Structure formats: C-alpha cells, structure tokens
Amino acid sequence: MAGLAPEGSQFDARQYDAKMTELLGTEQEEFFTSYDEVYDSFDAMGLQENLLRGIYAYGFEKPSAIQQRGIVPFCKGLDVIQQAQSGTGKTATFCSGVLQQLDYSLVECQALVLAPTRELAQQIEKVMRALGDYLGVKVHACVGGTSVREDQRILQSGVHVVVGTPGRVFDMLRRQSLRPDHIKMFVLDEADEMLSRGFKDQIYDIFQLLPPKIQVGVFSATMPPEALEITRKFMSKPVRILVKRDDVTLEGIKQFYVNVDKEEWKLETLCDLYETLAITQSVIFVNTRRKVDWLTDKMRSRDHTVSATHGDMDQNTRDIIMREFRSGSSRVLITTDLLARGIDVQQVSLVINYDLPTQPENYLHRIGRSGRFGRKGVAINFVTKDDERMLFDIQKFYNVVIEELPANVADLL
C-alpha cells in the first residue's frame, strides 16, 4: 500500500487566467457567472431533510471550502466549473447537487456522471448511494471489465443516476440500453485526467446524444486548454469556483498505518497499542458522533480513562472536557472531525485515526496538531480493506508515503 506517492498536480491561478484570456479574449467577463455566496453549514443550504440526514450519517459535520461554495449553485441548476484538488470534498459536492434535484417518482436516468477510471466511478457510486440513502436513490456504475448484459438488465429495470467511464457509457447509449431522454445533469469528474487519457472524442460523442437543455458540471484539479475548450462548447455562463489547498504542513510528524482485517478488530488493536505504549496524551478520531459514544463506553469498560467530545454536546460541556484534557487530568480524547481544527494541546504526542477521514483534506487538520509548536508527533491510521483507496488518496494528496507501523513504535514516542 505504501510506496512512492505520486506528485500532486499543483494549481496556478495566474496561469489559468492567462490561458482563459488567450482562449476567450474579451468574452471572459461575459463567459462566467459570478457567484460569491458561502454557506458555513449544510443546514443553511436549503437541502431536503432526507439529503441532510444522509450527509450527516456519512460523517460530514461541517462543509469543506468547496462544499461551502459549490453545492448551492449546482442545486440551483447553474453550470459550474469547480477547480479543486482531489480530496477537498468535491465528490460530495456534486453528489449533493444531483441528489437535491432528482425527481424520485420518475425511475429514469436523470443524471450522468463520467469519471476517468473504474475505481473512481465505483467510489462515486458509493458516495452517491450513501448520501442518498434516505431518499431511496437508485444508482448504477457502468464501467468496463464488467458484464454488458448485467448493465443492460439493471439499466432497463430503471435507475435515477448512472456513474461510469466514457467507453462503457457510450456503448450503453449506442445500444439504447441507457435512454438519454430524461437526463438533465451531466457531470465530468477529474476532467483533466479524462482528457489526458484520450477520452476527449468519446466525451464529445456522448454529449451529442444528450438532450440539448442540460446542466453541466466540470470538476478538475487543473484546467488544461482542452478542458477549457470543453467548457466553452458545452456550458453556458458557468459559475467558476476555485479552492486552493491549505498551507499547512505535515513536517515533523511520523505517519504509519496498521492493517486491520475487520472493522470489529480495531478495538483490540487500539487496546493493544495503549497497553504497549507510554503515551502522554493522545487524540482518537472516529467518523460519527454515535461511534464516539460507543468507543468511549468500550474503552472505559476496559479501565482506560478517556474523555469524549462531539457536535451534539453543548459548547459549555465541550469547553469543560477540553479544559480537563489540556490540564492533563484526562489523557485520551475521542472526537470527530468537527473539532479537529480546534484541539491545541501541546502535549499531544499521538493521533490515532480509528476511522480514516471521509475526505483527505481533513487528514491534515487531524494529525497536523500532533507536531504543533515544533514538537514531533506520531500518527497511526487503522486501515481495513475498504480504507485502502482512501489511504492511497491521502498519500497522493499530500505527496507523502505512509509506512506500515514498525515493531519499535515505543521508541518513536
């Protein structure tokens, strides 16, 4: 799993603007729609109740920068170009926009999402299905290397959303197994990657088969000229949303992963670690409030002194718990991402990601604190089979290598 992490593509806003000016000349002002509203909570976005339930159940508590600016314009039916590194929560941005606008009483394909690889398409399908869990959404991934007949059967039985790779999607449209008549949203994810893999012609071919009035969303880490060309051809007055990466570093923090075969075995792994290590103070991150309570009970029943905070507690209670943790009267704090940015505790030498974060950018906010004030720190990530993709994405996003936990971990703390 660990191995050299690929270089993250850096984004240069000046270069982008220069290319835009070259391509659009004086039309640039008219080409974009300006949209400056920022929503700092999901509740403020006017989303359906059952979509909000899905978002919170998935483990999101507070929208990331791109979600704060990108979900609402997409929900309003505007064309959007969103430029952000992978891992900034862009998948959930367009999934929320799509799920908000579907007519669930019509079991026809209303949204088509294209991705460059099979793995990414399947990952998007998973997120779409999880966020739409309480809405009863029907999603299907059309990707190469799977049974054509099975695809045809599922499409004919009716789905709301198709996520897929260009080759298989075009094939399904050509065979008329995927009927485009009701498609009203078209999303290109990792557009730069799709174009660099030579899918340009196929994307154009697919677009020709879609209804003329369609909402288009383009999501990409970089904007090569070909991507701009696509935006010109397919989009009308798109909203441009640009999110830069945080300038926080992971320097001085040693990062490891532990393979855990099953979710149920994480607890044993955690207790083993606490028995073998002399830890001054540590923070354990999980993805849901319910899990905070569950893990706190389990740890206490095994005689570990732990405190816990999460978003359901009132501010006063959270402040008291944080004071106790800072003063050292409790050594282990169990919490969720909501509080990741606010834990300024100098003695924290170890951060454990009991659950990997749901988006790579939160990884930094979680573990970036264990090396605060120049102190060295250690981060240990529990990784099940289902987490391997996220671990890879985190390594790619930060251009780091996360090694397997060595036997002599006690010497590092």
Curated annotation (Swiss-Prot):
GO terms for molecular function: ATP binding; ATP hydrolysis activity; RNA binding; RNA helicase activity; translation initiation factor activity. A motif (Q motif) lies at residues 40-68. GO terms for cellular component: cytoplasmic stress granule. ATP binds at A84, Q85, S86, G87, T88, G89, K90, T91. InterPro entries: DEAD/DEAH_box_helicase_dom, Helicase_ATP-bd, Helicase_C-like, P-loop_NTPase, RNA-helicase_DEAD-box_CS, RNA_helicase_DEAD_Q_motif. It comes from Nicotiana tabacum (Common tobacco). Keywords: ATP-binding, Helicase, Hydrolase, Initiation factor, Nucleotide-binding, Protein biosynthesis, RNA-binding. It is an enzyme of class 3 (hydrolase). The keyword Methyltransferase does not apply. eIF4F is a multi-subunit complex, the composition of which varies with external and internal environmental conditions. It is composed of at least EIF4A, EIF4E and EIF4G. This is Eukaryotic initiation factor 4A-14. Pfam families: DEAD, Helicase_C. Its EC number is 3.6.4.13. Coiled coil: none annotated. ATP-dependent RNA helicase which is a subunit of the eIF4F complex involved in cap recognition and is required for mRNA binding to ribosome. In the current model of translation initiation, eIF4A unwinds RNA secondary structures in the 5'-UTR of mRNAs which is necessary to allow efficient binding of the small ribosomal subunit, and subsequent scanning for the initiator codon. Residues 252-413 form the Helicase C-terminal domain. CDD domains: DEADc_EIF4A, SF2_C_DEAD. GO terms for biological process: cytoplasmic translational initiation. Belongs to the DEAD box helicase family. eIF4A subfamily. The keyword Manganese does not apply. It catalyses: ATP + H2O = ADP + phosphate + H(+). A motif (DEAD box) lies at residues 189-192. Residues 71-241 form the Helicase ATP-binding domain. It comes from the Eukaryota.
